[in-house]
Amino acid sequence: MAMATQATLFSPSSLSSAKPIDTRLTTSFKQPSAVTFASKPASRHHSIRAAAAAEGKAAAATETKEAPKGFTPPELDPNTPSPIFAGSTGGLLRKAQVEEFYVITWESPKEQIFEMPTGGAAIMREGPNLLKLARKEQCLALGTRLRSKYKIKYQFYRVFPSGEVQYLHPKDGVYPEKVNPGRQGVGLNMRSIGKNVSPIEVKFTGKQPYDL
């Protein structure tokens, strides 16, 4: 509104309609009234800005509590080198030819020895590593070892016979034992087990104590 009022004041039509007599006297005489008139919308703008700033802070606080927007799974590079291993991983299961197999990848800061989930020891290369395994549990076992002993983050995938790659873990980019804002708890009750109702109270109701 203030900008629209100023635009009408300085429009050519308003200037042409004004009387061209004693311009300097009129300007000097009306200066105090213009100053007092401008002081009112200034306070109004200040209150609007203060309200907008408060709304901005509230919106920022809400955004921090919400879940992070979108997670893009890392793409699998089939050209990643495998660790140096002289033994055998037991080979892929026969179902890998008709169903799927699993691939775990990680990046090592240096060349170091690690224990294979299938037995034996291997040397992980400095930089990216890729290892094919027959079972998902083997990937989880190796990944747990990488994180606990070597402080290395990992991810693994499921590869189908058609060549399709499915990203599996960590699903939302954060490992399950870590807190992730916005992650929904499954079967979560914010109470101790001692505060559950007595099982006899829900007997024959089709419910469980943790449902109430």
Curated annotation (Swiss-Prot):
Signal peptide: none annotated. The keyword Plastid applies. GO terms for cellular component: chloroplast thylakoid membrane; photosystem I reaction center. Keywords: Chloroplast, Membrane, Photosynthesis, Photosystem I, Plastid, Thylakoid, Transit peptide. It is found in: Plastid, Chloroplast thylakoid membrane. Residues 145-153 are annotated as: Ferredoxin and ferredoxin-oxidoreductase binding. Induction: By light. Residues 53-62 have a biased composition (Low complexity). Transmembrane segments: none annotated. Belongs to the PsaD family. PsaD can form complexes with ferredoxin and ferredoxin-oxidoreductase in photosystem I (PS I) reaction center. PSAD may encode the ferredoxin-docking protein. This is Photosystem I reaction center subunit II, chloroplastic. It comes from Spinacia oleracea. The gene is psaD.
